[in-house]
Amino acid sequence: MYSGQHIKEPVTRVAGLQKSVLPMLVVDSITLFYGNRKVIDNVSFSIRPGEIITILGPNGGGKTSLVRVLVGINQDYIGTIHYTKRPIIAYMPQNFKVNSFMPMTVEYLLLSACWGRGISLDLRAVIQYVDISKLLTRQISELSAGEIQLVLLARCMVMKPDLIVLDEPVSCMDVEAKNNFYRLIGKLVSKYNISIIMTSHDLHCVMACSDRVICINRSIRCEGTPEEITESAKFMSVFPENV
């Protein structure tokens, strides 16, 4: 359920950076069922402009189901999502489907994100910032998994979003590519003051990037800064493979 309710919270600092007084999104008591099976149980959190939140959890723990609620794909939930204003939300799904029967260049895919939106963000600046100029004339089907993720990130950026939701964005990358991707995310947030919510099942790769980590296994088990999370007894009991 959408609400335009304004939320009043004190100014705080996250990762040493001054954050907006008001969160741009507040998730309040979200519960979701698939049939009789509860996949999300009473999840609540908020995010401010310029903040990076990682939703960490095991496979099958409800991460993807939660982000599908946040971006409006799944609307059959209990609870409320509050916005201080109606935001532009860009979504990067975990599995991008490439249709081999409809060839598409990288440039065409990026331009398609601009059509009918009146977007003012300079497409060329985004292409240079994400460093995909050399990929523009190539077919999407020819790209590696890591290259596709960079292109999809650029596509999100040209929408001039307030919030980008990334579902397991680095699951197909090696360690070096993961680190480079997370560094790029941090730079984009600093430059454009956008908010990021991303899912992962690997804490170690998000340590240098996230302001906050929310550990979920249907319900929220613990949350805090990456440093606080790794010291949490609840985290170690639920996600021992990440310790």
From Swiss-Prot:
Assigned EC number: 7.2.2.20
Q: Where in the cell is it found?
A: Cell inner membrane
Kindly give the InterPro entries that the UniProt entry links to this protein.
AAA+_ATPase, ABC_transporter-like_ATP-bd, ABC_transporter-like_CS, Metal_Ion_Import_ABC, P-loop_NTPase
Binding positions for ATP per the UniProt entry = 57-64
Q: Which PROSITE patterns match?
A: ABC_TRANSPORTER_1 (PS00211), ABC_TRANSPORTER_2 (PS50893), ZNUC (PS51298)
Which GO MF terms are attached to this record? ABC-type zinc transporter activity; ATP binding; ATP hydrolysis activity
What is the protein name for this chain? Zinc import ATP-binding protein ZnuC
